[in-house]
Swiss-Prot record:
The keyword Lyase does not apply. This is Protein C4. Keywords: Early protein, Host cytoplasm, Host nucleus. InterPro entries: Poxvirus_C4/C10. The keyword Ligase does not apply. Induction: Expressed in the early phase of the viral replicative cycle. It comes from Vaccinia virus (strain Copenhagen) (VACV).
């Protein structure tokens, strides 16, 4: 994630009441100070927070949530210091979503971000709370995120960057660079295909040249039958299959039925594809073999080298 993330859709509403109930059994301090609680109750709450965060972040390998939960009380010095550790993140959850209490974060000395929503931010940032008057109004806990390896990040639009990964986890589109072993029936050398989690394929590049016909095929075998052979009426001569029952992009346990295929339409989306295409040209040393067999006598074998780039795209 970036250094700051604001949760403004009530993501933590399900545990807000649990935190309020936990506060009722906390021994109240008579001085203006914070109270840190660690118990079996906070472990359960931490587990709930972890599950919520897993739904919010993509390409995360592991999320650790501290079972130490700090209830923040009014401090007359208006300054909060919980730890000297500046690695990881703080998560702030408001006990009551009143707009009067605010978190102020300072990315730079000249910049302030103010929020009255639940918020998560890097421990390296300076911060303070405003209008925390009388009683406990919010809780804080420490969060650690470990990300899956990312090949690179590519700008998708003016405000968003996407991680390009070699991992299937938490992704829903695979950009496949497919190089074909020489064969007298094949007219192409390299094609690039988008494969969604239902296995449907969209041809987007030939010889690294953008292809805009937007024809969606139910499988890679169907795409090959329609597009890569020199012979006319190939469908009347043979059909293709993968004897291992594999999909070209996804493990079988990752396949999902009913997915809509992402089709690039806007200039920004085609610019994104062009950037991905350029990266693929110079980062294709890792590949898998994929084999299709034609039911001729004797059988005809077509071998492909496939380099895979996984992306998570929000689309309908």
């Amino acid at each position: 994630m970036d250094t700051i993330k604001i949760f403004n859709h009530g993501e933590f509403d399900t545990i807000r009441n649990e935190l309020v109930n936990l506060l009722k059994v906390v021994k109240w301090n008579t001085i203006n100070s914070n109270v840190t609680v660690s118990s079996t109750d906070t472990i359960d709450i931490s587990d709930c927070i972890r599950e919520i965060l897993y739904k919010q972040f993509k390409n995360v390998r592991n999320i650790e949530v501290s079972s130490d939960i700090s209830f923040i009380k009014y401090n007359r010095f208006n300054d909060t210091t919980l730890t000297d550790d500046n690695v990881g993140y703080y998560l702030v959850i408001y006990l009551n979503r009143t707009k009067s209490v605010k978190t102020l974060i300072y990315p730079t000395p000249e910049t302030v971000i103010t929020s009255s929503e639940d918020i998560m931010f890097s421990k390296s940032l300076n911060f303070r709370f405003e209008n925390v008057k009388r009683d406990y109004k919010l809780v804080m806990c420490s969060i650690s995120l470990t990300y899956k390896p990312s090949i690179c990040r590519i700008q998708y639009d003016n405000n968003k960057y996407l991680d390009i990964s070699d991992s299937q986890e938490c992704n829903n589109i695979c950009y496949c660079v497919i190089t074909m072993d020489p064969h007298h029936l094949i007219d192409l050398e390299t094609i690039c295909v988008l494969v969604d989690k239902s296995g449907k394929c969209l041809l987007v590049n030939e010889f690294y040249i953008r292809f805009r016909k937007n024809h969606i095929y139910n499988s890679f075998a169907d795409l090959c039958m329609d597009h890569i052979f020199e012979l006319p009426n190939t469908k009347e001569l043979f059909t293709l299959r993968n004897d291992d029952g594999r999909n070209i992009a996804w493990d079988n346990d990752k396949l999902e039925s009913g997915n809509n295929t992402w089709i690039p339409k806007t200039d920004d989306e085609y610019k994104f594809l062009s950037k991905l295409m350029n990266i693929a040209k110079f980062n294709n040393t890792k590949f898998d073999y994929y084999v299709l067999v034609g039911d001729t006598d004797p059988c005809t074998v077509f071998t492909f080298k496939v380099t895979k780039y996984y992306i998570n795209l929000n689309y309908e």
